[in-house]
Swiss-Prot record:
One of the record's GO cellular component terms: cytosol
GO biological process terms, semicolon-separated: gluconeogenesis; glucose 6-phosphate metabolic process; glycolytic process
Family: Belongs to the GPI family.
Gene3D superfamilies: 1.10.1390.10, Glucose-6-phosphate isomerase like protein, domain 1
Enzyme Commission number(s): 5.3.1.9
Species, as recorded: Pseudomonas syringae pv. tomato (strain ATCC BAA-871 / DC3000)
Annotated Pfam families: PGI
Record protein name field: Glucose-6-phosphate isomerase
Length: 554
């Protein structure tokens, strides 16, 4: 059986053993010296595809490092795993399912069978259904209970039904369709619903309830709150169908809620939530930017899919990024990875990538049920630059941990103000440069002497001004954020995550830890509300329940 389904000991593979020795040889490697010694280093460690330009030259690597990492990808059978995932094999072993989010962006005419049925016609049927709905709303033909056109769309969903769509609709706000505003309601916190309700009017609002089961607790509670609010504002049960539609595989529950069957968009069990923005879950995206731009998003992702499948591993963007992550996580003991977008409209990409990466690769068990033999997924964190430079970048530069980083920056701003974007771009490049170069003790001392300080003051302050440098980063550059390029960018990270799961032997498409929390939450709720007097399984949880019950009013 293939390694990706029944993994052996990856640490015993020749390439892994060679990488272990190579890591020791790289202990004193200096990126500064590497750039000085090799004027062609930049050209050797850059590539472009699907509208993205990747500079990975500021990494603790040589050509030999890359060769060994690529050899590891070959030894774990990555090529076969990529093909298996793309053509619908059961790569999600714990749930016995394929993982076919890539099918959502495949063109008409392609064929892909799941359980003997070609799914591509269904994919495009749903796209046509979305096109019709989006057209009616944008043309003012979909009317609320007072016959006024829809002006606001509220997506009710959580996790993958929220993070991906929010990222894309906000990243592409420059492409927004005038006349329709999109909002997101995710958290089961009354304050979020309250704040939203102050911005919309029931008579001109359409709610999209996005839940595969139509039973996700947070989503269902928010949908019920929205329904009650709609009725309290003057809406009626008879006209409910004008204001609520659903994306779900549980038609019966959606119909019972009051949604007409023709206004229910399907979900398939071969698409995981965190990979679902390409499906009808992306309805708020299409409503925000228009269906033609949504299809451009799909097209960009498809272009990256083709690159991922066909490019040699040493020229394959997702594969190289994945291998670099393995290099730092498993051989340099890096525990986290920073995502640093230098673009205001990409401010939510870190949140989406947190779910994509950490929910996929936050695993300690391999596909066959045996314990993982290596560290697996890192903590993903970060935020928009240049704000981070005045917050956590200090830790990146002078902290004791190695934290690789991805800088993401466009060349062109949609909203140029004086020379702001030149400064933003300069800040992005200078941060990656500073991480790589650092500042030596000799440089720090010389700098202080040039300021006229006494030698005593120089020796006292110089240690604090030393920056270790040699901190790795990648820089991803796009000409400007467009639907096509954003689609390619998100798809690239999806593929990166999958590659790492193959190497570690884990399943990137389940999330049993999330399920446990849901189950326990129901039991705690029953104890909080007096539904059961049976004590919790531990004294801490029971003590906190008692504390709540003794003080909660309302």
């Amino acid at each position: 059986m293939a390694y990706y389904r029944n993994p052996s000991d990856v640490t015993a593979m020749p390439a892994w053993q060679a990488l272990t020795k190579h890591r020791q040889a790289m202990q004193d490697f200096s990126m500064r010296e590497a750039f000085t010694d090799d004027p062609k280093r930049f050209s050797q460690f850059t590539l472009s595809s699907a509208g993205l330009f990747l500079d990975y030259s500021k990494n603790l690597i040589t050509a030999e490092t890359r060769d060994l990492l690529v050899a590891l990808a070959g030894e774990v059978g990555l090529k076969d795993a990529i093909k298996a995932q793309y053509y619908g094999e059961l790569v999600n072993s714990s749930e016995g399912r394929p993982a076919l989010h890539t099918a959502l962006r495949r063109p008409v005419g392609d064929k892909l069978k799941v359980n003997g049925v070609d799914v591509i016609p269904d994919v495009h049927r749903v796209l046509n259904q979305m096109t019709e709905l989006v057209g009616r709303i944008h043309d003012g033909l979909w009317r609320g209970y007072t016959e006024k056109p829809i002006t606001d769309v509220v997506n009710i969903g959580i996790g993958g039904s929220f993070l991906g769509p929010e990222l894309v609709s906000e990243a592409l706000v420059a492409y927004a369709h005038k006349g329709v505003r999109c909002h997101y309601l995710a958290n089961i916190d009354g304050s979020e619903f309250h704040e939203l309700s102050m911005k919309i009017r029931a008579e001109t609002t359409l709610f999209i309830v996005s839940s595969k089961s139509f039973n996700t607790l947070e989503t269902l509670k928010n949908a019920q709150a929205a329904r009650a609010w709609y009725l309290a504002q003057g809406g009626s049960e008879v006209e409910l169908h004008r204001h609520f539609i659903a994306v779900s595989s549980n038609n019966a529950a959606a119909v019972a809620f009051g949604i007409r069957e023709e206004n229910i968009f399907p979900m398939w069990d071969w698409v995981g939530g965190r990979y679902s923005l390409w499906s009808a879950i992306g309805l708020p995206i299409a409503l925000a930017i228009g269906m033609s731009n949504f299809k451009e998003l799909l097209s960009g992702a498809y272009t990256m899919d083709q690159h991922f499948q066909s490019a040699p591993f040493d020229q394959n963007m997702p594969v190289l990024l994945a291998l670099l992550g393995v290099w730092y996580g498993n051989f340099w003991n890096a525990q986290s990875h920073a995502i640093l977008p230098y673009d205001h409209y990409l401010r939510n990409i870190t949140k989406h990538l947190q779910q994509l990466d950490m929910e996929s690769n936050g695993k300690s068990v391999r596909q066959d049920g045996t314990p993982a033999l290596t560290d697996t997924g890192p903590v993903i964190w970060g935020g928009v630059g240049a704000n981070g430079q005045h917050a956590y970048h200090q830790l990146l530069h002078q902290g004791t941990q190695m934290i690789p980083a991805d800088f993401i920056v466009p060349i062109v701003s949609f909203n140029p103000v004086a020379d702001h974007h030149q400064w933003l771009y300069a800040n992005c490049l200078s941060q990656s440069q500073a991480l790589m170069m650092g500042k030596t003790r000799a440089e720090a001392e010389a700098e202080l002497r040039d300021k006229g300080m006494s030698e005593e003051e120089v020796q006292k302050l110089a240690p604090h001004k030393v920056i270790p440098g040699n901190r790795p980063s990648n820089t991803l550059v796009v000409e400007r954020i467009s639907p096509r390029r954003l689609g390619a960018l998100v798809a690239m990270y999806e593929h990166k995550v999958f590659v790492q799961s193959v190497i570690w032997g884990t399943n990137a498409f389940d999330q049993w830890g999330v399920e446990l929390g849901k189950e326990m939450g129901k039991a705690v709720y029953q104890r909080l509300t007096g539904g059961t007097e049976e004590p919790a399984d531990d004294a801490s949880t029971q003590g906190l329940i008692n504390y709540f019950r003794g003080r909660h009013r309302g």
